[in-house]
Curated annotation (Swiss-Prot):
UniProt KW Protease keyword: no
Main localization (coarse): membrane
Pfam families noted in UniProt: Arf
Name of the gene this protein is made from: ARL8A
Domain of life: Eukaryota
Record-linked SMART domains: ARF (SM00177), RAB (SM00175), SAR (SM00178)
Annotated function: Plays a role in lysosome motility. In neurons, mediates the anterograde axonal long-range transport of presynaptic lysosome-related vesicles required for presynaptic biogenesis and synaptic function. May play a role in chromosome segregation.
One function term, GO molecular function aspect: GTPase activity
Keyword annotations from UniProtKB, A to Z: Cell cycle, Cell division, Cell projection, Chromosome partition, Cytoplasm, Cytoskeleton, Endosome, GTP-binding, Lysosome, Membrane, Mitosis, Nucleotide-binding, Protein transport, Synapse, Transport
Cited PANTHER family: ADP-RIBOSYLATION FACTOR-LIKE PROTEIN 8, ADP-RIBOSYLATION FACTOR-LIKE PROTEIN 8A
Sequence similarity: Belongs to the small GTPase superfamily. Arf family.
Annotated protein name in UniProt: ADP-ribosylation factor-like protein 8A
Organism per entry: Gallus gallus
Annotated positions binding GTP: 29-35, 71-75, 130-133
One GO biological process term: cell division
Length: 186
């Protein structure tokens, strides 16, 4: 009975209140950050992406949730900006190229360095291992191990294996983010 009441209450809220969340998307260059933004915004995959110079901001509406998404460049010269754009967001989305095992160590180090910043304490993190459609791509369990995600104890952390190209697990990723925007305000 309580579950039915909560669903009815959520439906009623959706009629009258829009929810907003702010996310920052970071990760090494060529991991698929901008592709992810395009796929969730339009459902379209484009093979010919140009690397993000600096940052892009995009607003995406999914149902009654408006997502303000900061897509920050992953080249070394832009990584010092990551912390600034991660402050005060609902969640940090950290993109990893799961098929490029040569960059996993660097990706792990950048993630842990970012999360060591006191200003980002407690902000939840969603790690996405992109390009699962490619041969040799790490699965979720391997990503958790190689990225040393179990060492992150001061915040909620979640990891999914996705493919922007095949649109694998994009829906569950969005569900986690939207649910998370609700729990952050409660």
């Amino acid at each position: 009975m309580l579950a039915l009441f909560n669903k009815l209450l959520d439906w009623f809220r959706a009629l009258f209140w829009k929810e907003e969340m702010e996310l920052t998307l970071v990760g090494l260059q060529y991991s698929g950050k901008t592709t992810f933004v395009n796929v969730i915004a339009s459902g379209q995959f484009n093979e010919d992406m140009i690397p993000t110079v600096g940052f892009n901001m995009r607003k995406i509406t999914k149902g009654n949730v408006t997502i303000k998404l900061w897509d920050i460049g992953g080249q070394p010269r832009f990584r010092s900006m990551w912390e600034r754009y991660c402050r005060g967001v609902s969640a940090i989305v950290y993109m990893v190229d799961a098929a490029d095992q040569e960059k996993i160590e660097a990706s792990k180090n950048e993630l842990h360095n970012l999360l060591d910043k006191p200003q980002l304490q407690g902000i939840p993190v969603l790690v996405l291992g992109n390009k699962r459609d490619l041969p040799g791509a790490l699965d979720e369990k391997e990503l958790i191990e190689k990225m040393n995600l179990s060492a992150i104890q001061d915040r909620e952390i979640c990891c999914y294996s996705i493919s922007c190209k095949e649109k694998d697990n994009i829906d569950i990723t969005l569900q986690w983010l939207i649910q998370h925007s609700k729990s952050r305000r409660s």
